[in-house]
């Protein structure tokens, strides 16, 4: 379900651009991807949990907007990120 703070810190450390980075698009997309993957498993098991499904769709939309922003801003960083995360785009 929700990410633990330790797991979130690991993701931030892995994808950050500089030492104090917590809000770059790469970090935000990586954290959202981990949350989406976790929630996707929950929704797969609990098919009638429409409330969680709506939250999942909201997160996917937010990630899509961040990916679009990153692609417009810096295509090279965008391509590296989707390759590291294994996203289909």
Curated annotation (Swiss-Prot):
InterPro entries: Ribosomal_uS15, Ribosomal_uS15_bac-type, uS15_NS1_RNA-bd_sf. HAMAP family: Ribosomal_uS15_B. Pfam families: Ribosomal_S15. Gene3D superfamilies: 6.10.250.3130, S15/NS1, RNA-binding. Keywords: Ribonucleoprotein, Ribosomal protein, RNA-binding, rRNA-binding. This is Small ribosomal subunit protein uS15. It comes from Listeria monocytogenes serovar 1/2a (strain ATCC BAA-679 / EGD-e). Belongs to the universal ribosomal protein uS15 family. The keyword Secreted does not apply. GO terms for cellular component: cytosolic small ribosomal subunit. SUPFAM superfamilies: S15/NS1 RNA-binding domain. Part of the 30S ribosomal subunit. Forms a bridge to the 50S subunit in the 70S ribosome, contacting the 23S rRNA. GO terms for molecular function: rRNA binding; structural constituent of ribosome. The keyword RNA-binding applies. The gene is rpsO. One of its GO terms (biological process) is translation. One of the primary rRNA binding proteins, it binds directly to 16S rRNA where it helps nucleate assembly of the platform of the 30S subunit by binding and bridging several RNA helices of the 16S rRNA. Forms an intersubunit bridge (bridge B4) with the 23S rRNA of the 50S subunit in the ribosome.
